[in-house]
């Protein structure tokens, strides 16, 4: 939905030059549970996930730059898992692209409590983790934060 713009010392990016912003949040019901979908830069906008309502897992495929990824990637993903009390699955491109752009990588899976269940720091590979809907229910029962929200 959101288009990335970054001006660093040695690099700058403006996705609006080549991409079009999305229209709205996306979630779908599956046999696993309710899944929310977003892309990369969207992870910086918590109001997007509030607009989606309650979901069991969030998928955030990304291509974070090295400077923004090193500083913010894991923190943002763990925060989204904790505040939504849902799994976060974040496949991430990493390495040097033909254009010279370098992306951060660090694909990971995080549980609803914010614990990192699996991570692939760099290079090609697969991240696997057990994801259990009972864990989502357990976390929400132990800390019913969404029931205590006063702003909607």
Regions found by a protein language model. Give the residues of each.
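A short C-terminal boundary segment appended to hydrolase-like catalytic domains
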Residues: 134-152
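Short acidic, gly/pro-rich beta-turn/loop elements at beta-sheet edges
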Residues: 8, 47-48, 117, 138-139, ...
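Active-site/binding-pocket entry motifs
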Residues: 3-4, 65, 95, 135
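CN hydrolase (nitrilase-like) catalytic-core segments centered on the catalytic cysteine
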Residues: 43-127
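Short loop segments at secondary-structure junctions
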Residues: 31-32, 112-114, 131-134
């Amino acid at each position: 939905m959101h288009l990335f713009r970054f001006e660093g010392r040695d690099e700058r990016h403006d996705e609006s030059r080549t991409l079009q912003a999305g229209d709205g949040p996306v979630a779908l019901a599956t046999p696993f549970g309710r899944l929310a979908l977003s892309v990369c830069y969207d992870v910086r906008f918590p109001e997007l996930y509030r607009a989606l309502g309650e979901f069991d897992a969030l998928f955030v495929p990304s291509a974070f730059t090295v400077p923004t990824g090193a500083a913010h990637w894991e923190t943002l993903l763990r925060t989204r898992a904790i505040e939504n009390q849902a799994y976060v699955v974040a496949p991430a491109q990493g390495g040097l692209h033909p254009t010279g752009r370098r992306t951060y990588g660090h694909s990971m899976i995080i549980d609803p409590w914010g614990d990192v269940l699996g991570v692939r720091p760099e290079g090609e590979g697969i991240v696997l983790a057990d994801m259990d809907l009972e864990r989502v229910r357990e976390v929400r029962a132990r800390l019913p934060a969404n029931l205590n929200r006063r702003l909607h």
